[in-house]
Amino acid sequence: MTLNSLPVWPALQAHYEEIRDAHLRDWFAPANDRAPTRAERFTFEGGGLAADFSKNLITDATLALLVRLAREAGVEARRDAMFAGETVNPTEGRAALHTALRANSPDAPFHAQVAAERAKMARFADAVRAGAWTGYTGKRIRHVVNIGIGGSDLGPKMVVHALHHVATPDIATHFVSNVDGADLARVLERIDPQETLAIIVSKTFTTLETMTNARSLREWFVANGCPEDALAKHFVGVSANPAEVVKFGIAEANVFEMWDWVGGRYSLWSAVGLSIMIAIGPERFAELLAGAHDMDEHFRTAPLERNLPVLQGLVGIWYRNFFGAQSYLVAPYSEALHYLPSYLQQLEMESNGKSAQIDGAFVDYPTSAVTWGEPGTNGQHAFFQMLHQGPTLVPIDFIAVLTPEHPLASHHPKLLANCFAQSEALMLGRTLDEARKIAGPAHPELAPHLTFPGNRPTTTLLVDALTPRTLGALIALYEHKVLVQAAVWNINPFDQWGVELGKILGKVVEADLTAPQVDPAKHDSSTSALIARARKALGE
């Protein structure tokens, strides 16, 4: 049953018409906001996090209808099927058991495999961190280079950056993803082959970008003095295809396994997170997993009415499918979470940017919104102008860490003040009458420019302190939000066929860029002209 054919759909449409012109300013007015206040009614906790939904365009009736939508759409059944290891990725015939990677019960699916691989990771990480694993000249490892792309890069990079304050200072971690040689070249300028460990991460070990960078890095090692028979001291592989890893030249003992029942964008909890474990240590990696498990249990057991991933997903549906929001913003007021927006871009848009329903029918309603963001306060000086005074509705997730993870504590009240003030300003706005008073009788023409419509919806997520455990919970919150929305939209969030066509045509174009001759009729006129210009520049 599709979204707009569910029994609750007409009631939601009617409710939207009732409140579409309401203003948050009025709902927060003292005369209307009596005990329990909106903040009290719409703030919920779970997995060590708190979420204030009160500055959203919702009422108690809205949430009741949205929860009914979740039930009618089968959110609970889809959730339970995922945790049970059922085939929730039907187009690829797979389970999606990233939750099993952080489950702490021997009854969890694949528990023995997961525990054995994590123990292998821990032994290796401890050896590298202690200096027992050395390079070909006997020097300890001081640089780790993670080569991967998509889920093999975004998650580990985000976590290593976020947990820099608890990472070992003895090892610098670098990430290379882009096939543009500049990405790898800039890292090569900063590392010494005698002290560098490369982690090559690819589910298939055939990914174009990853294998191109891996080959170039291997050539660099040899060109800079590493004997070929000593490369085993400097290369390890993470893959679901161990045979290809060995074929590449990595020693079998240096292969770490991931599994096809873990999607790439959900894989940082697996051996894909080896760079994380080396940076922060096995004990803190276990805390990262524990935090994600905390949120798993909250998602699995909390009533829908107080379930953070469910509420977050449903509020997103409310704006996407009723208010017509084209995008939503993630604004972490934490420089440590600098890479969270780019991580969430893949998590949300690669998962739910689909037009085909599970049964193959095409949707006739919007699915994934564009996800974007930048840490605060940087974003305030870039695009917040549009958020405050532009005509486009952009719902926002603010993320605030209440205690700093760095020694410059005097900065932190300023950071938090900006976060909370932005949510208040976006909600309240400034009326034309208020603007006229500010402009004064000498400059009445400025009043329209000083007017803020307000009524811009925001959710504020609060984290007491940024630790491996709270970070794990935060990531899992967004993972489960994606599943909730996928269930409501009746789509499969665990495949990504949309990346395939470009890959196929890319191989054809790459061959044409270096071929002796190219048939201009092989491509459309635009692509043929682009190839011709590139061939000329490349000297072909």
UniProtKB/Swiss-Prot annotation:
The keyword Cytoplasm applies. Its main location: cytoplasm. It is found in: Cytoplasm. Keywords: Cytoplasm, Gluconeogenesis, Glycolysis, Isomerase. It catalyses: alpha-D-glucose 6-phosphate = beta-D-fructose 6-phosphate. InterPro entries: G6P_Isomerase, G6P_Isomerase_C, Phosphoglucose_isomerase_CS, SIS_dom_sf, SIS_PGI_1, SIS_PGI_2. Its EC number is 5.3.1.9. Catalyzes the reversible isomerization of glucose-6-phosphate to fructose-6-phosphate. This is Glucose-6-phosphate isomerase.
